[in-house]
Amino acid sequence: MTKLVRQSVTLPASARELYAMYLSPRTHKAITGGKVVISARPGSKFSAFNGMLRGRMLHTVPGRLIVQAWRSAGWKKGDLDSTLILRFTPKGKKGRIDLVHANIPDHDYRGVNNGWKKYYWRPWRKYLSRH
């Protein structure tokens, strides 16, 4: 069985800025602390946290949407890739990210669900408070 993660976060930057930060290897690394290879080009490979997360870009809408095929290095060989959808929308002077992460293997659901909060949303909020 697989599971679905849904999360929303509002951060003190515009939706366009948040989109650009996620797709900038330099800023993404500054936020998360791990090496990142990423591009907005559909079909391009990406990796984060020094290769612990990897996949490919499926689709982007500049400033608004990122869709990735995504998997963790800790997943079993037979586990299918998951699909990550990040939607960026304005919320006043802030930006909102709505995340849908589908096809998460049962054995890593808790890790993925908590990982978004621990390794992305909290560090991103901290990064933005300093910049």
Language-model features: locations:
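Hydrophobic ligand-binding cavity/cleft-lining segments
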Residues: M1-V37
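Hydrophobic residues positioned within well-ordered beta-strands of beta-sheet architectures
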Residues: V5-Q7, L84-L86, I97
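Alpha-helical scaffold segments that form or flank carboxylate-/histidine-based iron centers
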Residues: A13, K45-A48, G111
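Tryptophan-centric aromatic hotspots in well-structured domains and transmembrane helices
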Residues: Y22, A69-W70, W116, W121
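Hydrophobic-ligand binding "helix-grip"
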Residues: K29, V36-V37, S47, G51-K94, ...
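A conserved amphipathic terminal alpha-helix motif
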Residues: N103-H131
